[in-house]
């Protein structure tokens, strides 16, 4: 498979995303694609993403992978993942251009349904995405969206959960479910919680959790994992939307609705005759160029995805969280933005 690298359109901690065009007679894939490239430091994450995408197969709501390749650039071996190109970038990039405004509820309903169909496919194949957020939902010219960035995705057990033996924080704090913080439990239910956070953000233009500038991200994890506090549901959202989110924001993952169940909820099944993709597309000016996810982490105002490992195990969430906020961990307050650490 031969291709020619184009301009750089985004950066991750260990990876760079570029456009690319195919050479003549180089296989059956689009003329314009996206290439995620990394050196040896990010090879494991890229390899995991390729393996997961291969296992998932084709799904209209999941970004397509056309293969992988290795190149030598400036004397260094690069690992490349050839992906479907999303011309409008991520929903996070798009909403940033709206200046804090949310999307129309009809658009939120449609995007939510698309992500749910993607999650249903992911979960049915025995995987959890582990990092659902607006930055990992890509937008196309026709207004459709697809789930992307499977670098943190993992295969789960038969009950659709996976338990890590080490003390690990995995994903993006603002989207983490209580069981991820308390029990190292990652699975389909955690993806549903994260989707609820994404729905709040799409509708309101604000994150589901309010955090003060300069606060330690571990203080947010304590709010998520300890006590009864839940993400705030927007007051202006319809009753169907509020009820939908109440099914996502259930502390007990066993009682949280599944993607399959939520696809039958009236919030996404309601028939809106005037809801056409064209109505959404015209809101984006042709000259507006948005970055494809993953974009430069220094452009995020919120904490980005990462993994943080420790060794001991603890008997209670309070003990575990206490260890995580100890003095051994630097105070990475929100003075800037967060890097993806995988």
From Swiss-Prot:
Which positions bear Phosphotyrosine?
A: 41, 66
Q: Which residues carry this modification: Phosphoserine?
A: 18, 93, 114
Indicate yes or no for the key word Cell wall biogenesis/degradation.
no
- The protein's superkingdom reads Eukaryota
Reported regulation of activity: Activated through serine, threonine and tyrosine phosphorylation, especially upon abscisic acid (ABA) treatment. Restricted activity by ABI1-mediated dephosphorylation.
Q: Where does ATP bind?
A: 9-17, 36
Q: Which reaction does it catalyse?
A: L-seryl-[protein] + ATP = O-phospho-L-seryl-[protein] + ADP + H(+); L-threonyl-[protein] + ATP = O-phospho-L-threonyl-[protein] + ADP + H(+)
* Residues making up the signal peptide according to the UniProt record: none
Q: What is its EC number?
A: 2.7.11.25
Quote the protein name from its UniProt record.
Answer: Mitogen-activated protein kinase kinase kinase 20
Q: Which organism is it from?
A: Arabidopsis thaliana
In the UniProt record, the gene name given for this protein reads MAPKKK20
């Amino acid at each position: 498979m031969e291709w020619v690298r184009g301009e750089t359109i985004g950066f991750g901690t260990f990876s760079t995303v570029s456009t690319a065009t195919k050479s003549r007679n180089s296989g059956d894939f689009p003329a314009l694609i996206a290439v995620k490239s990394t050196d040896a430091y990010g090879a494991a994450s890229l390899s995991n993403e390729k393996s997961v995408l291969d296992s998932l197969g084709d799904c209209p709501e999941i970004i397509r992978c056309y293969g992988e390749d290795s190149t030598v650039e400036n004397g260094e071996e690069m690992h490349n993942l050839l992906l479907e190109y999303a011309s409008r970038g991520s929903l996070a990039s798009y909403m940033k251009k709206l200046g804090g405004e949310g999307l129309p509820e009809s658009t939120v309903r449609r995007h939510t349904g698309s992500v749910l169909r993607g999650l249903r496919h992911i979960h049915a194949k025995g995987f959890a995405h582990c990092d659902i957020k607006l930055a990992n939902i890509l937008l196309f010219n026709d207004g459709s969206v697809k789930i992307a960035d499977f670098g943190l995705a993992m295969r789960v057990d038969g009950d659709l959960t996976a338990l890590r033996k080490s003390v690990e924080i995995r994903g993006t704090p603002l989207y983490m479910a209580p069981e991820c913080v308390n029990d190292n439990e990652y699975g389909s239910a955690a993806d549903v919680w994260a989707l609820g956070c994404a729905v709040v953000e799409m509708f309101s233009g604000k994150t589901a959790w309010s955090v003060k500038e300069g606060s330690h991200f571990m203080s947010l994890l304590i709010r998520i994992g300890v006590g009864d506090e839940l993400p705030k549901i927007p007051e202006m959202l319809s009753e169907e939307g509020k009820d939908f989110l109440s099914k996502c924001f259930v502390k007990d993952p066993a009682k949280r609705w599944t993607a399959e169940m939520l696809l039958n909820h009236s919030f996404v099944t309601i028939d809106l005759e005037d809801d056409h993709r064209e109505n959404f597309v015209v809101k984006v000016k042709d000259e507006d160029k948005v970055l494809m996810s993953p974009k430069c982490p220094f452009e995020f105002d919120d904490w980005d995805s990462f993994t943080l490992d420790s060794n001991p195990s603890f008997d209670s969430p309070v003990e575990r969280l206490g260890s995580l906020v100890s003095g051994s961990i630097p105070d990475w307050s929100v003075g800037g933005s967060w890097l993806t650490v995988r």
